[in-house]
């Protein structure tokens, strides 16, 4: 298992002199619940501090005042029990390049509805732009009807796909080009994972998506136990085995969080953070990590976008998957170092998650 952090930290590019906010991605953070708006704020703050161009926070309407006061740079989109979650999901997923789903979301019925609609919309957009085998469509292939069915539920992904396709009638080549420019990523954390673990049909949707675009999951040991057949004790004894099994079963980049966090993907890449950062053992640190990974992905994407538009479809997908792994490892390393740097100011016992987030940009600059 790889442990050389310099390999990844050297891959952080300088910010392009000709860039604008769109260059560095549009990140949708679907997070927070009533009484837990901090998770949405921390993930959004970390995304901005690690390089993201635009962040939109999708959270209950009751969180508006606090979130907009703490992070006025973020776009706020609120919802409540009367919201049309289908329309809400389609509008926000269409806007975003990167989706962070789950921090502080809760597992109540409203949160489950939001997760279901977001996953169905992402799956539908994947199917419009890609064929049934997860290969980017060509012009000729796009003329044919895609007959593959994704997992069924009350409002299945295929029906969402047909609706979106009829509302956005573009040539398949244009859709393919837009898809490559977006290079979308889905990251699922915290209550997003807890909702999946209790609903196999939603986990099947994630499998469907992961066969088409990179999906990152970031469980801690208890969340991993809920997602897998392994017990908590087995996971603690051999976290790498649990992470490898989840990555292979679902095609994800899997982050097994711990004192020495492990990152594995379905292509066989594996990395272990060689240096613990005890200052991170505080509430909100996982939310910061999710935002950091998303922000780093946006930065790497801006640097590698030209290479991603060259070569065969399979070569493009290989680069795309590798970029997701690189961004995840780099995010883990930056997060750990930011915690250590924050501890120099506030002490190891005294670091708050937002202070770790605030150090991300400084660590990246170094």
Task: Indicate residue ranges for each PLM-predicted region.
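Short glycine/serine/threonine-rich phosphate/pyrophosphate-binding segments
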Residues: 35-50, 56, 108-111, 193-197, ...
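Glycine-rich phosphate/dinucleotide-binding loop and adjoining beta-alpha-beta core of small-molecule
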Residues: 1-5, 58-275, 310-319, 365
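Substrate-binding N-lobe of the ribokinase-like
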Residues: 20-75, 81-83
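Positively charged, low-complexity intrinsically disordered leader regions
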Residues: 1-22
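Glycine/charged-rich beta-loop-alpha catalytic/anionic-binding loops adjacent to active sites
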Residues: 21-29, 267-279
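Short glycine/threonine-rich catalytic loop with a Thr-x-Gly-x-Asp
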Residues: 16-23, 34-36, 277-293, 320, ...
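Charged C-terminal helix
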Residues: 336-366
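Short, small-residue alpha-helix embedded
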Residues: 226, 282-317, 323, 328-333
